A protein has these predicted regions:
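Bacterial Sec-dependent N-terminal signal peptides
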Residues: 1-28
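Extracellular interdomain linker/stem segments of modular secreted and single-pass surface proteins
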Residues: 16-19, 94-102
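Solvent-exposed, low-complexity, repeat-rich "mucin-like" stalks and linkers
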Residues: 18-50
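Beta-strand secondary-structure signal
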Residues: 21, 42, 73-75, 206-210, ...
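Serine/threonine-rich, repeat-prone extracellular segments and beta-strand-based repeat modules
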Residues: 49-88, 94-95
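Ser/Thr/Gly/Pro-rich, low-complexity flexible regions
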Residues: 98-224
Length: 224
């Protein structure tokens, strides 16, 4: 339950300004398993001591897609006859609530990380940073599926053309395996050629995966 205001009046320049008290049922973040049905618990509003719920406008509810992992904001708002707007916000996390471990942290590429280009030429690289952010249970965001390859080449004074970082959401399973969603290269949605060997060892804090993008394959090993 969330309240967007702590009373029915505010005082400005010695004048009483009635406000809307928003009372959001349920939690500010609700986790829903992928494929499940989401039923919004809703929000009520009180204005000058009277029920004002029928004046609430809801934005974002229709955008919630439980088949696509991610975070979906829902906004509830009410406007008084005087034109003052009050609101409350909820986030629906489409994730895997069964996952109890956390996979967030700053990771370094480790031995075994390499790029194999379309011609079979291998290039190892280590000690580049990859950030993993925990969004919800079993749902994280990784800032570069390529393991910071282009940043590593730049640091080694071997800059290459077409530098790209690939961001993605990772939906984790209880056994540590995972799949990528909402994949973007430099902020634009893209398709990967392949993604495999994806595991996370919670006890050791080690990520591994193999990703192929535009014909080049990257074997990634990350240590936390």
């Amino acid at each position: 339950m969330g309240l967007s205001a702590c009373g029915d009046e505010s005082f400005t320049d010695s004048k009483v300004t009635p406000i809307v008290l928003m009372d959001m049922a349920g939690d500010a973040m609700i986790e829903v398993a992928v494929g499940a049905t989401y039923n919004d618990p809703g929000c009520t509003a009180t204005y000058m001591g009277k029920d004002y719920t029928d004046k609430i406008e809801v934005d974002g509810l229709d955008a919630v897609n439980t088949n696509a992992p991610g975070l979906y904001p829902i906004y509830y708002s009410c406007t008084t006859p005087e034109g003052h707007t009050y609101g409350a916000e909820r986030v629906v996390a489409v994730c895997n609530p069964k996952v109890k471990y956390k996979a967030a942290g700053t990771f370094l590429t480790a031995t075994g990380t390499k790029r194999v280009d379309a011609n079979g030429v291998e290039q190892a690289y280590t000690k580049s940073f990859v950030n993993v952010t925990q969004l919800a249970s079993g749902l994280v965001r990784v800032d570069d599926l390529l393991g910071g390859y282009y940043a590593a080449m730049k640091a080694a004074n071997q800059p290459t053309d077409g530098a790209v970082t690939i961001q993605a959401l990772l939906l984790m399973a209880a056994d540590g395996t995972f799949k990528p969603y909402s994949v973007k290269a430099n902020g634009k949605a893209v398709q990967l050629d392949a993604f495999s060997n994806a595991t996370f060892n919670d006890k050791k804090g080690v990520f591994t995966w193999t990703v192929t993008y535009k014909g080049d394959t990257y074997n990634i090993v990350l240590n936390r």
